[in-house]
Amino acid sequence: MINRLVIVAALMFLASCATRQDAPGDSVSQVESSGEKVDSFVETEIVTPGMLAAEKLASTEPSVYFDYDKFEVKEQFALTIEVFAEYMRAIPGSRLRIEGNCDERGTIEYNLALGQRRADAVKAVLVSMGIDGDRIETISYGEERPRNSISSEAGFSVNRRADLISR
């Protein structure tokens, strides 16, 4: 019997020590009744330099075009290449593949070699901008991957390109 009295006394003691916490609904109604306005939670998105560079990259034409039988990078494509360089600087683990392409004129062997020179020329510009050449792969498809199959100068000019593909 004494054991039961001790247990009941201990439970009453613990119950008297407990504090009452208001339910979440009570505090909201108190704030609303006091006239204060409660703003809803605003979610803030953190934007990193890598995210900005990726967004800029997504809105950039990923090709550099060349004149007939040439592999010199024209000044008008400096901005395109710079966007890829910014992306690679912002995301250190990123890699790039540059695919050289040609129009259908010339032999298969000649166009494969010219496509490789085009890809290598774009890579050289990126390396001159401080990008590690080991992060850039070049390949030539020659005339095998045309964008336009129309045999005209307009069609040919679209096929003389180096495509930049981030990975």
Language model feature labels by segment:
Residues F13-S16:
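C-terminal motif of bacterial Sec signal peptides marking the signal peptidase cleavage site
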Residues P92-N101, Q116-R147, R160-R167:
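A non-catalytic structural micro-motif
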